[in-house]
């Protein structure tokens, strides 16, 4: 049982017959990032499946200053340790508590990719310069050093900064070429 706001440290991999992660998800149509250490089979709110209420997209690649995502065709395509973006398909106000359910091998660390996630809070100095997704889902902008918001919470994903000069932002291309 994993809960938002708490780090997850797993020194060795293991197999879980049932795993859950609970957090408040936006229901205003805004995009957010997520990474989980298990394969997801359902999203529930108040005990009712709401997986059909969400669009979930997986990272495809980065080309120049464009980050490309492809929509999952089925929630069971959601794989452990891979970072995703998701949004509720309505324009209501606020949040709803969501429980992500699944099972499988729980790895010690998330998959390492340009778009990656973390199971522990990444603090200001280490987060600075990495890129966070805006709520509109249109771009990744750099986290500024020495600001309270320059953190990456556990179970969130980010675009890693490069070693050389980095662009001011990356645009997002959603499934089928639609730009957020």
Residue ranges of predicted features:
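A broadly used, surface-exposed interaction patch
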Residues: 49-57
């Amino acid at each position: 049982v994993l809960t938002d706001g708490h780090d997850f440290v797993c020194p060795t991999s293991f197999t879980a017959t049932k795993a859950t992660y609970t957090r408040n998800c936006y229901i205003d149509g805004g995009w957010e990032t997520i990474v989980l250490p298990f394969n997801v089979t359902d999203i529930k709110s108040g005990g009712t499946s709401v997986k059909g209420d969400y669009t979930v997209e997986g990272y495809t690649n980065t080309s120049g200053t464009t980050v490309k995502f492809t929509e999952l065709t089925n929630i069971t395509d959601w794989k452990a340790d891979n970072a995703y973006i998701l949004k509720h398909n309505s324009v209501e106000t606020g949040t709803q508590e969501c429980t992500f359910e699944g099972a499988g091998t729980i790895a010690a660390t998330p998959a390492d990719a340009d778009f990656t996630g973390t199971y522990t809070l990444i603090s200001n100095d280490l987060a600075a310069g990495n890129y966070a997704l805006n709520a509109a889902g249109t771009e990744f902008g750099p986290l500024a050093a020495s600001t309270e918001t320059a953190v990456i919470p556990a179970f969130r994903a980010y675009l890693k900064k490069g070693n050389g000069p980095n662009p001011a932002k990356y645009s997002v291309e959603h499934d089928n070429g639609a730009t957020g």
